Amino acid sequence: MKVYINDTKLINKKFYPLELFYSGYLPNIKSNIDPKKFYTIMIVDEDAPSKTNPINKYMIHLLIINNKTTIFDYKPPNPPINSGPHRYHVLVYEQSNIIDKFNINIDSRPKFNFDKFVLTNILKLFDKFMFQTERI
């Protein structure tokens, strides 16, 4: 998987300054998907509000189903001040079927039940990427 912010190609598992994500550009996510299949794409923060106290794990920063149906628009990383580095996961899941967006019952971005969503929708991990950032 390749992830770009503006012209910056991110490197898997690297740390980036928070300002990079406030450039006004959406992330450009590239993966070798099969155009005949359907995928779910998400970006989640597992360290919300902090790695030592992740009570809002997982915070959704992007959720797209069926290749192009947006459930949650992109929201740039926004970790609390002095909460330490946050790990942001960019995930692409292959879907076994088309997901009915009206059957998705997610009320808010924090406390996303990641495991339940994957199991309920019979998703298979296809590609993954992780970057870190923090607010000092």
List where the protein language model places each region.
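N-terminus-centered regions that define maturation/targeting leaders and the start
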Residues: M1-I136
